C-alpha cells in the first residue's frame, strides 16, 4: 500500500510539471467565466461613518438605532493653515501715565523709616501691614503719588552757561615776509621786531631801503661754478670735420757726408 501511494505521488508531480510546461491558451468563454467569478467575489462594503465631536456613530445591525452626527459639528481642521501676521494694537489714545509697581524692598525701606505720629497714638502697630507684607498707609501714599491721574511734573532744568570754545584759525599757506610778519606782531602789541639783530621800538615803521628785510633781484649774485681738481679740461673745437691733423715724423736725420777718410784711402 505504501508503494502504491508513493507511485501516485510520483505521477501526480509529473502531471503538474507537464501542465506547467504546456502553453497557456485562454479562450473567450474562460475569460467571461473568470470575470463573472471576480464580480461575485467582490462584496460592496459600506463605508464606516466617521465619529465626529458631539455624536457617536454605530456600525453593524444597530445602525438605524445609532445616534447621528449633528450638522452643527465643527469642520475638521486642515493640515495647512495660512499664516496671519499679528497686528499690534495702538494704546496711545488711552492717555495712560506712568504706572509704578511697589517692590518688597521699597516697602521695607518705608517701614524702617516710618515714625509714629499723633494719628497712630504714638504707637506703631505691625497689624496695619497686610498679608503680603506691605504697609497699607505707605501703599496708599505711594498710590496717590504715582497713579495715572497724577501728572508727572518735570524737574526744573538748570540753565547751563555755554563755555566759549576757542576756535583755532586755519593757517594760511601764503608766504609772509619777515618784515610784514614783524609789523603785524607790532600792530597787535605782541612786541617789537628786530632790525639787523638789534631790537627796534614798538610800532616803528620798517626801513624800506634795508635789503635784509626787502631783498631785490638785482642784488642777487650768481654763484660761479667751482671746478673740481680732477676734472679734465675741454678745448673748444670749431669745424672739427674740416680740421685734419698731420702727424710729424719723429725719425732721426741721416748724415750723408763721410765722416771717416778711411774709405777714400782704400779706394786709392
From Swiss-Prot:
**Ranges of compositional bias, category Acidic residues:** 76-85, 123-132
Region described as Disordered: spans on this chain? 40-145, 184-268
A GO cellular component term found in this entry reads: cytoplasm
Where are stretches of biased composition, namely Low complexity? 51-61
Q: Which InterPro entries match?
A: CDV3
Residue ranges annotated as compositionally biased, kind Polar residues, are: 98-107
In this chain, composition skew of type Basic and acidic residues spans 40-50, 221-239
Q: Matching Pfam families, A to Z?
A: CDV3
Family, similarity comment: Belongs to the CDV3 family.
* Name listed for the protein in its UniProt record: Protein CDV3 homolog
Q: Which organism is it from?
A: Drosophila yakuba
Q: What is the lineage of its organism?
A: Eukaryota, Metazoa, Ecdysozoa, Arthropoda, Hexapoda
